[in-house]
Amino acid sequence: MSGIDPKRFGKVAVLFGGESAEREVSLTSGRLVLQGLRDAGIDAHLFDPAERPLSALKDEGFVRAFNALHGGYGENGQIQGALDFYGIRYTGSGVLGSALGLDKFRTKLVWQQTGVPTPPFETVLRGDDYAARATEIVAKLGLPLFVKPASEGSSVAVLKVKTADALPAALSEAATHDKIVIVEKSIEGGGEYTACIAGDLDLPLIKIVPAGEFYDYHAKYVADDTQYLIPCGLPAAQEAELKRIARRAFDVLGCTDWGRADFMLDAAGNAYFLEVNTAPGMTDHSLPPKAARSIGISYSELVVKVLSLTLND
């Protein structure tokens, strides 16, 4: 697909593993990315920052990195800043886009100021009076609600709350993962979708139909009964407009090159954006490979396309 001489990429590190709650997902993503790059003849090697200092990248002659780290320092701008310091080109967003993209609270603040629709929400801080805040939030947002740590990915510690009595415990649990907790009004009626972004590729939307209550960690990476509908079933004009809004949701955060934007539709077909992902999973359950495969792009071709974006000025 790319027609790029593999030698142009030089020595490539596939960053994987790390120390976040998403380490196991990242290990799987990294190994598959490595195979995809090597299948294309690229000189790629695994590199786990949890086991080796980043300075080794420069010492060992790496000139480029495919970031398959998920969550934590791999996705919050820290790795990106270090790679900038060492002069190593890397996939995905830079420091600002990565930091904002992993922070659901500040993502939503930016979207509110730039006209990107997002569900109504409240924030709770670790140590707040959870019972009192729960009463206030239910009165303001109603039920059901989603409770999530502000800076975890892969739906780690995300809980759906259907009763007011269950909310204080959900707040307490989420606060063990992050000092800021997002409580979001549940958008019902139209389903969950994702828009995958990879440079100028026109990837189709995916409708996600989990067997359980919502698309949680188990549905994303373990279960085989989650349905991924491609095509998504929406009229072509509506799909095109939603992809346009998704790209805007990505761009206003300073995100670049590739990632995902997730959103819900209500019963009237209105979109509400939930989050972006600047270092999407690349496992056999992950969404970007599914979207690419549906239009005839292999896994190897997709990872080469993503890596090729690091050749741009």
Curated annotation (Swiss-Prot):
Catalytic activity: 2 D-alanine + ATP = D-alanyl-D-alanine + ADP + phosphate + H(+)
Protein residues bound to Mg(2+) 2: 275, 277
Cofactor(s) needed: Mg(2+); Mn(2+)
Protein's GO biological process: cell wall organization; peptidoglycan biosynthetic process; regulation of cell shape
Listed pathway(s): Cell wall biogenesis; peptidoglycan biosynthesis
Annotated binding of ATP, by residue: 138-193
Entry's cofactor comment: Binds 2 magnesium or manganese ions per subunit.
Keyword flag ATP-binding: yes
GO terms assigned for molecular function: ATP binding; D-alanine-D-alanine ligase activity; metal ion binding
Enzyme class, UniProt record, top EC level: ligase
Protein's job: Cell wall formation.
Name of this chain's protein: D-alanine--D-alanine ligase
Source organism: Burkholderia vietnamiensis (strain G4 / LMG 22486)
Gene behind this protein: ddl
